[in-house]
Amino acid sequence: LCPCRQQAAILEDLVTNVPLEFDFLFSKSHAEVISGKQEGVYAWIGINFVLGRFEHKDEEDAVVTVALGDQAEALVRKRTVGILDMGGASLQIAYEVPSSGTFSSPQQEEAAKSLLAEFNLGCDVQHTGHIYRVYVNTFLGFGGNFARQRYEELIVNQTYAHNSLQGQRTGLSAETPFLDPCLPVGLEDTVVRGGQTLHVRGRGDWQSCVELLQPLLMAPNNTQASLAGAYKAPIDFTNSEFYGFSEFFYCTEDVLRLGGRYDAPSFTTAAQEYCGQSWAVLMRRFHGGLYSAHADQHRLKYQCFKSAWMYQVLHQGFHFPLDYPSLRTAQLVYDREVQWTLGAILYKTRFLPLRDLRPESVRQAHGSWLRLSFVYNHYLFFACIVVVALAIVLYLLRLRRIHRRQLRSAQLDMLWLDKVVLLPPSTGPGP
């Protein structure tokens, strides 16, 4: 989304200014613009690391059989989790592909190569027990906010075209609004796109909204991927598990309070009930504190649309079955937020000799302590001198006291010897 020239300027600014503000080594190789594929791989590594999916399997753990490269025997190990992440601008999916599979055409095989990442998380390149093949795809323009913009362009263009053909004035004034199925009942709004203004009023028909969003699964333009037509590595829905983050969690939790294990029928019922409520009722509920503390009026306004969009993406775009039981929507994992940066650290340091680094880190820490103590902390330096000088003085005083005690003891011994009387030897009586 950021032009290459701006990317280069940001990196140059970092390389120039970070060393001025901080004292650690920072070179040009320490900053880079990563691709969506790299970010997806790092995010996948991070969440699976936190969940312990790279550890050796226990008896109760779900497992998967993995066939990699030229290995004669398939490997059985812990099943990893896939991730779904919908932001405001983009949509991302990443999951392990246990087997290479087959391709219907050379074009599909070529597309698959650009979307599959194979990497080793073992302690060295010979350790093949932790080689993973992960499918990663990022769809720009398919995030919740961008999808709404594309939807507004769609209804503006369609309504103006319909008016031109039928000689009508739908949406040209507040008295004859376009009835938007993706807004709550009675909510009035104005949409401006390409110099054209469309007056809309919500009619809260969630099912119609879902159907109206179907064309948006295609690519927004020729330079971006199409969710409907993009290559997707096969998913074994009978032996897989996914976590949905960001908009997947907000759509299910902030208003509907259904975060956690995703159940399509329950979600559909709750979404339809919400969309069918009048805007006035929703505002009363909002001011009454019935929704999540994270919910605001923007969330209430677009919840109907975003829930329909999430549903379309999940079930029509990625073809998740309606009875799929293993999707969880979440914001935190084990009470902490998992970022892709954790996966980046794990990936970058996977081959480092940690046992050799530990003594080195101790030496570096010791050297850093000396530098801080004797160069930057003058007070501590002078305090050490005072303590040493005081210790020397106390030691000399103690030696002096011991010397005096020994001298006094010697004088007493001499005085005692002077007072000793030498007696002649005794003689017995004569015969």
Predicted segments — roles?
Residues 2-81, 91-431:
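Helical "lid/coupling" subdomains associated with nucleotide-phosphate turnover
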Residues 83-85:
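Short hydrophobic beta-strand that contains or immediately precedes a catalytic carboxylate
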